[in-house]
C-alpha cells in the first residue's frame, strides 16, 4: 500500500511529508488518503498540542532520574503503558520520549530528564519504557541522538567525543532501543558531533543507525534543530520539525532538480514517514486529534507506587520510618513543604491533573491527635513566584495598544508561551497583548516584582513603570535562551490594599529560523529574609521532630540552561544548619534532579532523596516516611562529595562548559562511578546505593559455567529477607578485566535484578551476560572485542559495596559487529 501511494505522489507531495505542518502535526495529503498525525512531548506525561504552558491536563509521572532510581524495568514498562494511554488521550500518535542522554557533569539542566550515568541501566530503562508506550499503538521517540549532555550553547556547540567513548558510553542506550525495543522514531540532538550537526551527520544517522543497527523508522529533528536542505536529507534526517517548512519545501524540490539530492532519497524518507503512519494505525482509522483529560485511578496508584519505588534513603540514624504515635509535635519546614515540586522544567513540563504537596500528604497521613507545624524558612526559586490570580488579557493587531482588542480572555497565571494565538486575526510576528490584574498584599513591606520576556514588555503598578523589559532588552537564559534575564525591582506595598498591575507585551521583531518565539512570565513575592529562618527555627524548637523539605524546582532543573553549581540554592544550607542546631531530630527530604553537595550531612539524622516524583508527591512521601512502604530506590548517579570530583569538572573550560564552540569529552569512558573507581575518589554516596527498612543476606554467586561461550552464561544469587518487614534489594553485576590490553574502567555494570521479598522469604537474582558484556570497542578494527582470558564478575549492592566475585574464562577472542 505504501509503495502504491508513493507511486501516485508528485515530487512536491513527497517533499511535503518531510516537514511538519505546524508545531505538533505532520502534513496530510487528502487526495491520496494520507492523514496527519500529532506528536506530543513527554517524557513524564503527555502535554498535547498548543503551548508549553497550560493545556489540557494530563497524568504527571515521575521524571526519568526517578524512574532510573527504581532499578525496576518491569515497573517502568507499566509507566510506559500508562503514558501511551495518556498520549492517545491527547490525540497523539507519537510520544517524544524517552530521553537517554548520560549524566556526565552533574550540572546538566536536563539531568532530571535522563535515567542514569550508566549506559546499561539507561538502556534497560529505555527499552522497558519504549515497550510499554509502543504496546499501546503509540510510537516512542528516543532522544537526543547524541552527546547532548549540556544545555550551554546547545544549538551551536560541538560535542567532541572519540569513537570508543561514543560506542561504549553514549550510543548503547540508542542501540538497545533499536535492537531490543524496535523504537519507531529517533530525534537528533541540537548540538554538533565532532564538528557536524547531528541532524546532518551521515556517519551517525545512516552508517551507525541504519546500516549497523538496522533502524527502519523515522529520524526527526529536534524543534528548530535542522540547519540545511541537502545535507540533512542526504545524511538521513527524514522529518524537519516543527512546521511549516524552513529548509525543505520548495528548497528541497529545487535541490532535487539541481542534482544535489536524489529523488530516490526523498522517496525513501517519505516512505519512512508513511511507514510510521501505518505502524500507529493511522491508515486504518484517521487519528482523532481532539484532546481530553484522562485521570484514571490506576494511573494515580501507579504514580504513587513509582514515587516510593524511586525514593532513595541516603542516611538513616534509626529515625525512619516514623511511628505516628511517637511524636506529638511535628514540624514540616522548607521551601518545598507547601509547594508541590512534581516535575522539571522545559519541554517536559505538563499541566498535571492535580498535585499533592509534601505538607498535604503528611497532613492526610496523620490523625487529628498529631500537631503539625509549618514554616517556609527561605525561598529556593530561581525566578520570582509567578503571578497567580484572575487577570484579563487583551490581544491587539500589530505592536501598540491604540486599536480595539481583537480578542479578550481571562487567565489565572502570569505565564505565556505562544505557539499560536486565540484568534485567527492575529499574527505571531506582529501582535501585542495587555494583561490587567489586581494584587492584594497580605503584609505591608517590600515586595519584589520580576519579569522575563521573549519580545518586549513593561510592567506597571498603579500606573508606575516598575519593571522595564523594553528599553535595553538583551537576550538572556530564559525561555530556551530567547528571553532576557529576569528583571526585578523592589516596591513597598501596604497590606490589604488593591494594586492594579498591568503588563504590556509586544511580539519580538527578530525571529528564530523564521519563527517568532513569543513568551512572557511575570510575578511578585515578598522576600522572607532573616525573619523566615527565625520563624523556622522557632517552629523547630517547639517540635519533637522536623521534616525539612529542601532542594530545587523546575526553574533550576530545566531545559535551556545548566546549573551554576551543585549546592542547594538560596539560603537552604543556612536553614538546615540553623534548624539542626535547634532540634536534634531532623529528617531532610531532598528534591533535586541530580546530585548535590551536603556539608550539613553530619548534623541531621536522615536524608531521603525524592527527586521529582509526579503528581502524587505528597502521598508517596508520606507512605515512605511513615513506613507504609519502604524507600525502594537506588542511586542511578554517583553523588560526589564535591563538584570537582566529577570527571567533567576541571580547570579546563574546554572540557566543561565548553570553549570556542567546542566541548571536549576528554574524560572519555571514565564517567560517573567509572571515574571514581579508577581514580580512587571516594563518593559521598556511590552509584547503586540506597538504604531500606529491612535487612538481607546474600548467598554465594553460582555460575552456569566457568567458560564463556557465544551464548553467554548466567549468574544466580540467592537473597533472603531476614528482617520483619517486606522490602527490596538490588543485586548488581559488574565486570572487571584484570588483564585488559587497553585502558578500561575498574568495573562496569552489565546486569542487575531487583527482588521484592516478604519477611523471611528468599528470592533468586538471575543475571545473564554475553561476550559483548566483556568487550571494549576496538577503534582500529571498528568492532567490539573481548580478548581471551580471565574476567572477574563482581556481585555488589552498590559501586563500592562488593559482596562477592567469581572468575570466568573466555577461551578465544570474540570480535563482534557494532
From Swiss-Prot:
Enzyme active site: 222
Which Pfam families does the annotation name? Fn3-like (PF14310), Glyco_hydro_3 (PF00933), Glyco_hydro_3_C (PF01915), PA14 (PF07691)
| Compartment annotation | Cytoplasm
A Gene Ontology MF term for this entry? Answer: beta-glucosidase activity
Q: Any idea of its EC number?
A: 3.2.1.21
> According to the lineage, what is the superkingdom?
Bacteria
Q: Which SUPFAM superfamilies match?
A: (Trans)glycosidases, Anthrax protective antigen, Beta-D-glucan exohydrolase, C-terminal domain
According to the UniProt record, one GO cellular component term is: cytoplasm
Q: What class of enzyme is it?
A: hydrolase
Q: Which GO terms describe its biological process?
A: glucan catabolic process
- UniProt keyword annotation of Nucleus present: no
Keywords assigned by UniProt? Answer: Cytoplasm, Glycosidase, Hydrolase
Q: Where is the PA14 domain positioned along the sequence?
A: 386-538
Question: Which reaction(s) are listed as its catalytic activity?
Answer: Hydrolysis of terminal, non-reducing beta-D-glucosyl residues with release of beta-D-glucose
What role does it play?
Involved in modifying a vir-inducing plant signal molecule. Hydrolyzes coniferin but not cellobiose.
Q: Which family does it belong to?
A: Belongs to the glycosyl hydrolase 3 family.
Name-wise, this protein is Beta-glucosidase
What is the organism field in this record?
Rhizobium radiobacter (Agrobacterium tumefaciens)
Amino acid at each position: 500500500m505504501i509503495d502504491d501511494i508513493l507511486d501516485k505522489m508528485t515530487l512536491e507531495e513527497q517533499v511535503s511529508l518531510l516537514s511538519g505542518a505546524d508545531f505538533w502535526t505532520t502534513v496530510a495529503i487528502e487526495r491520496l488518503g494520507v492523514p496527519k498525525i500529532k506528536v506530543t512531548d513527554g517524557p513524564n506525561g503527555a502535554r498535547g498540542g498548543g503551548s508549553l504552558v497550560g493545556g489540557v491536563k494530563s497524568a504527571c509521572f515521575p521524571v526519568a532520574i526517578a524512574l532510573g532510581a527504581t532499578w525496576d524495568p518491569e515497573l517502568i514498562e507499566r509507566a510506559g503503558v500508562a503514558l501511551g494511554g495518556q498520549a492517545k488521550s491527547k490525540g497523539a500518535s507519537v510520544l517524544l520520549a524517552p530521553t537517554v542522554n548520560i549524566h556526565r557533569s552533574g550540572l546538566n539542566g536536563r539531568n532530571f530528564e535522563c535515567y542514569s550515568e550508566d549506559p546499561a541501566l539507561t538502556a534497560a530503562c529505555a527499552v522497558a519504557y519504549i515497550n510499554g508506550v509502543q504496546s499501546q499503538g503509540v510510537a516512542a521517540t528516543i532522544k537526543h541522538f547524541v552527546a547532548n549532555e549540556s544545555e550551554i550553547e546547545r544549538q551551536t556547540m560541538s560535542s567532541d567525543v572519540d569513537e570508543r567513548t561514543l560506542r561504549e558510553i553514549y550510543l548503547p542506550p540508542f542501540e538497545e532501543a533499536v535492537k531490543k525495543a524496535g523504537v519507531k522514531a529517533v530525534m537528533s540532538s541540537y548540538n554538533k558531533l565532532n564538528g557536524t550537526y547531528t541532524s546532518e551527520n551521515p556517519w551517525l544517522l545512516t552508517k551507525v543507525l541504519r546500516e549497523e543497527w538496522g533502524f527502519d523508522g523515522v529520524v526527526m529533528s529536534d524543534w528548530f534543530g535542522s540547519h540545511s536542505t541537502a545535507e540533512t536529507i542526504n545524511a538521513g534526517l527524514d522529518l524537519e520539525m516543527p512546521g511549516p517548512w524552513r529548509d525543505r519545501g520548495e528548497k528541497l524540490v529545487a535541490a532535487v532538480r539541481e542534482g544535489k539530492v536524489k529523488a530516490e532519497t526523498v522517496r525513501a524518507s517519505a516512505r519512512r514517514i508513511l511507514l510510521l503512519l501505518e505502524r500507529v494505525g493511522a491508515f486504518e482509522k484517521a487519528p482523532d486529534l481532539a484532546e481530553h483529560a484522562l485521570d484514571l485511578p490506576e494511573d494515580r496508584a501507579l504514580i504513587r507506587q513509582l514515587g516510593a519505588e524511586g525514593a532513595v534513603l541516603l542516611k538513616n540514624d534509626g529515625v525512619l520510618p516514623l511511628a505516628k504515635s511517637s511524636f506529638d509535635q511535628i514540624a514540616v519546614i522548607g521551601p518545598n513543604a507547601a509547594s508541590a515540586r512534581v516535575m522539571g522544567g522545559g519541554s517536559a513540563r505538563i499541566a498535571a491533573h492535580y498535585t499533592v504537596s509534601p505538607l498535604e500528604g503528611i497532613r492526610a497521613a496523620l490523625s487529628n491527635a498529631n500537631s503539625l507545624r509549618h514554616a517556609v524558612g527561605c525561598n529556593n526559586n530561581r525566578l520570582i513566584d509567578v503571578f497567580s490570580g484572575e487577570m484579563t488579557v487583551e490581544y491587539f493587531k500589530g505592536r501598540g495598544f491604540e486599536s480595539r482588542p481583537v480578542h479578550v480572555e481571562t487567565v489565572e497565571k502570569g505565564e505565556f508561551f505562544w505557539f499560536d494565538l486565540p484568534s485567527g486575526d492575529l499574527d505571531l510576528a506582529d501582535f501585542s497583548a495587555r494583561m490587567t490584574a489586581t494584587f492584594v498584599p497580605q503584609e505591608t513591606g517590600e515586595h519584589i516584582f520580576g519579569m522575563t520576556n521573549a519580545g518586549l514588555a513593561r510592567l506597571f503598578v498603579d500606573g508606575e513603570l516598575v519593571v522595564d523589559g523594553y528599553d535595553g532588552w538583551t537576550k538572556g537564559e530564559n525561555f530556551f535562551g530567547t528571553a532576557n534575564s529576569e528583571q526585578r525591582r523592589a516596591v513597598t506595598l501596604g497590606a490589604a490594599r488593591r494594586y492594579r498591575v498591568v503588563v504590556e507585551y509586544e511580539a519580538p521583531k527578530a525571529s528564530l529560523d523564521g519563527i517568532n518565539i513569543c513568551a512572557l512570565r511575570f510575578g511578585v513575592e515578598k522576600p522572607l529574609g532573616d525573619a523566615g529562618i527565625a520563624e523556622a527555627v522557632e517552629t523547630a524548637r517547639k517540635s519533637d521532630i522536623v521534616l525539612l523539605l529542601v532542594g530545587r524546582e523546575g526553574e533550576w532543573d530545566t531545559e535551556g540552561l545548566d546549573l551554576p553549581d551543585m549546592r542547594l540554592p538560596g539560603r537552604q544550607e543556612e536553614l538546615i544548619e540553623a534548624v539542626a542546631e535547634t532540634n536534634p531530630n531532623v529528617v531532610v527530604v531532598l528534591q533535586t534532579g541530580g546530585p548535590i553537595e551536603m556539608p550539613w550531612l553530619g548534623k541531621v539524622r536522615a536524608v531521603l532523596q525524592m527527586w521529582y516524583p509526579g503528581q502524587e508527591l505528597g502521598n508517596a512521601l508520606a507512605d515512605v516516611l511513615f513506613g507504609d512502604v519502604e524507600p525502594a530506590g537506588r542511586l542511578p548517579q554517583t553523588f560526589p562529595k564535591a563538584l570537582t570530583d566529577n570527571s567533567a569538572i576541571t580547570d579546563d573550560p574546554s572540557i566543561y562548559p565548553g570553549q570556542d564552540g567546542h566541548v571536549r569529552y576528554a574524560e572519555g569512558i571514565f564517567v560517573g562511578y567509572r571515574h571514581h573507581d579508577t581514580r580512587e575518589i571516594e563518593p559521598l554516596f556511590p552509584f547503586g546505593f540506597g538504604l531500606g527498612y529491612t535487612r538481607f543476606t546474600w548467598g554465594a554467586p553460582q555460575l552456569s559455567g566457568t567458560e564463556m561461550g557465544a551464548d553467554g552464561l548466567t549468574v544466580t544469587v540467592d537473597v533472603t529477607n531476614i528482617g520483619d518487614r517486606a522490602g527490596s534489594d538490588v543485586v548488581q553485576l559488574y565486570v572487571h578485566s584484570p588483564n585488559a590490553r587497553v585502558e578500561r574502567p575498574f568495573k562496569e555494570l552489565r546486569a542487575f535484578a531487583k527482588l521484592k521479598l516478604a519477611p523471611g522469604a528468599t528470592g533468586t537474582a538471575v543475571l545473564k551476560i554475553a561476550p559483548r558484556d566483556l568487550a571494549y570497542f576496538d577503534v582500529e578494527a571498528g568492532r567490539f572485542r573481548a580478548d581471551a582470558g580471565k574476567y572477574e564478575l563482581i556481585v555488589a549492592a552498590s559501586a563500592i559495596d562488593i559482596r562477592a566475585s567469581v572468575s570466568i574464562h573466555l577461551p578465544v577472542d570474540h570480535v563482534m559487529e557494532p
